[in-house]
Amino acid sequence: DDDLDARVLEHIDAFFAGLPAAGPDHEAATRGPWWFFLSEKVVAITQGRSYFVWDIKVGRPARVLSRYVTRTPAGIGLGSPFTMQLAIQEAGLPRVLYASAGGAIGKVIGRKGLFYELVGNQINAIDGPTEYSAYPSNVSAKLAPKDPDAVAARLSAAIRERVPEPWRSTFGGTVIMDANDIGRNVLGSDVPGDWTRFEEMFADNPLGQGSQQTPMAMVFLREDTAQA
């Protein structure tokens, strides 16, 4: 967690230190309200909730259940024995079996996502290894970050202590985002109210899904357009 805070503040400091030299266009673009966005994957890694696949002891239930999961080009989901094993460890085998039965019924009646509704525990945020991901994500599987709301609040407090005015006053808070090329979901934030607007801001997945290695973003609301 300390390493995460230090990395975040390093980038925040560098951004505002370089802003005066960036010119009037950049100064104008940063006058409005702004938020700090952070990939949930980075939070999970710093919490020790990411595991190399060779360290995950896969049981028979995980091997069997993972065969029935629909895979998409945007991510492996629970369609891997490794990610399914993490789901079982996180939620418990009885609950995963219960949710699997419900999910099967959901497919019959045309209701998508019933498995994740029933299993809970942010199992939908579990990620597995993909070829297009940068190391170590190409050889690891991870759980959702723990206590993401608390992490967001802690980072926001640290940012407010470091950011100069007037940006300190216009800072809205931190958003921990789970995004890929087919969807996005706010896992945690210290910003009150509806988080739908933040998911809409990330409709085109600006942090990327592959080798971009851009897990952080500062999003400013343009005063002249009222758009992020």
Located regions from the model:
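N-terminal and secondary-structure boundary signal
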Residues: D1-A228
